[in-house]
From Swiss-Prot:
Taxonomic path: Bacteria, Bacillati, Bacillota, Bacilli, Lactobacillales
UniProt-listed NCBIfam families: gatB, PRK05477.1-1, PRK05477.1-2, PRK05477.1-4
Entry protein name: Aspartyl/glutamyl-tRNA(Asn/Gln) amidotransferase subunit B
Subunit structure: Heterotrimer of A, B and C subunits.
Organism expressing this protein natively: Ligilactobacillus salivarius (strain UCC118) (Lactobacillus salivarius)
Record-linked Pfam families: GatB_N (PF02934), GatB_Yqey (PF02637)
GO biological process: glutaminyl-tRNAGln biosynthesis via transamidation; translation
Amino acid sequence: MNFETTVGLEVHIEMQTNSKAYSPSPVQYGAEQNTNTNVIDWGYPGVLPEINKGALEFGMRAALALHCDITQDVGFDRKNYFYPDNPKAYQITQARTPIGTNGWLEIELEDGTKKKIGIREMHVEEDAGKNTHNPDGYSYVDLNRQGTPLIEIVAEPDISSADEAYAYLTKLRQVIQFTGISDVKMEEGSMRADVNVSIAPIGSDKLGVRTEMKNLNSFEHVRKGIQYEVKRQERLLMSGGEVEQETRRFDEPSGETILMRSKEEANDYRYFPEPDLPPIHISDDWIEEVRASIPEMPDKRRERYTQDWGIPAYDAGVLTQTKEMSDFYDATVAAGAGPKLAANWLMGEVNAYLNSKQVELSDTALTPEHLATMIKLIEDETISSKIAKKVFKEIITNDTEPKAWVESKGMVQLSDPAKLQPIIDEVLDNNEQSIEDFKNGKDRAIGFLVGQIMKKTRGMANPKMVNKLLMASLKER
């Protein structure tokens, strides 16, 4: 029997607001434990939450970027459960009126196939705190994260493989990062995925019983977890067993999923309207104001790069992997660099430097203006590509103006025929045998002579001009 896979994804993304969703406590990753929290986060009796307008607008921005319809009359609900990192014993969410519905995201697989994945709904809610279990036998609760604004993005069950899930998460992270509402760093917990997996016989009109994997914190774990879970369920069904609805965790060392608990149903959480927060009406004008704040999305940028600037589709994809790189590229071209050469430098030397140092562009001294100036020096043949690499090392580590630095170091390329010709003549006079070799059709003689000229000029001669003058001189001899 053959089966088809159905994957459901619920993705939680922390929003980078200045303060929490319903309290004035600051949002700051990495702060000392329990320093960014207050009585609202602790759930003290008699304290009242207050809606963070910025969090609501960030949620609207994400919903619009994902082509969702905005719910114009939104309310808030309590999701009731007890856990040490949730001292209120409930989470404020949007069970009845999600901020966005009926959206979609287009993914592209490695073979170039494109597919639209539906977005069922998107909620604005709050994060829980963090439990730490120490070897001393005690568990500790850090409430800095408690109340941090989240968006929960619920995909339709349109994903049918581990690779599609991986592509969806990659594209979702890219789109959200471009909106500017989150840094979407899975390693820091600002993007987490819950995965539902089920299988059913091919052609069946009913979905199989699903299992859930919670809080997967890397795309590769999602892919491997789905692959293992599909095989596990296939083995169960083929041996006459049944798939149980349960929550499992992905164990990285073994590459397997391990049972955590039987799955709760929605009614286990006893949802009811949040009595301390009023419903909010989102006007058409407010929606359009938020829409206007959304920057150009990666798909549009790729289209512009390929159609307007002639950049290959693959290169355009690399340049739009992050908003930081794409913004830097746009600014470099705006500063006067040729689009193709700017793309080559960013994808080549710049990316190589960032990867080797494990840093981001913002951690370096490089500016679009300085990179553009260096590229223009290459384009007008003031410096060679070889010299440009030395210039690049200087401008990415120090706040140095490239043109002034090149001139101060005597690195300006020698292109003046009046200065090059005497050097060429001297090399030819000292290498009669190479002239004979050239006349006898031995092309390698040219390479030798060019090398001698470059040696005489300490590598500063313009290779194009050297070749032009050398060929003319050889024809005269």
